[in-house]
């Protein structure tokens, strides 16, 4: 239930590529397309965040990370929060040097709001 624009600063989604643990390997598009369509219809013009995202380990994880950052940004996301935990599976970016390097490259691309950068947050909110 959307309370209305005057009560909402950002909208966000979360999603995971569970790999073989649940539904098989899924791309960012597989995981987020329906949710992105719905949230953009409900709250057009609001800044978008991917509030939680993760990917199971595998030979394609680094490519999945690169693709996900790019597709999230292309979809309008200004912020992405990685689920950096070893829980049901090892979601962490830091568990593999190649994955960590891919994430660092993707996260330093222009357009992302970075932690502690108040001016970028203000600009993303149109303030």
Where are these regions (language model features)?
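Glycoside hydrolase catalytic-domain groove-lining segments
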Residues: 6-59
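Aromatic side chains
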Residues: 2, 16-18, 82-83, 118
């Amino acid at each position: 239930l959307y309370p209305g624009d005057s009560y909402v600063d950002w909208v966000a989604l979360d999603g995971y590529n569970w790999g073989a643990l649940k539904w098989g390997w899924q791309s960012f598009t597989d995981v987020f397309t329906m949710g992105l369509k719905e949230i953009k219809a409900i709250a057009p013009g609001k800044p978008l965040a991917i509030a939680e995202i993760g990917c199971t380990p595998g030979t394609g994880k680094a490519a999945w990370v690169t693709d996900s950052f790019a597709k999230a940004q292309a979809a309008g996301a200004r912020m992405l929060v990685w689920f950096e935990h070893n829980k049901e599976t090892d979601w962490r970016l830091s568990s593999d040097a190649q994955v960590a390097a891919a994430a660092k490259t993707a996260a330093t691309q222009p357009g992302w709001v970075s932690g502690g950068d108040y001016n970028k947050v203000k600009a993303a909110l149109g303030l």
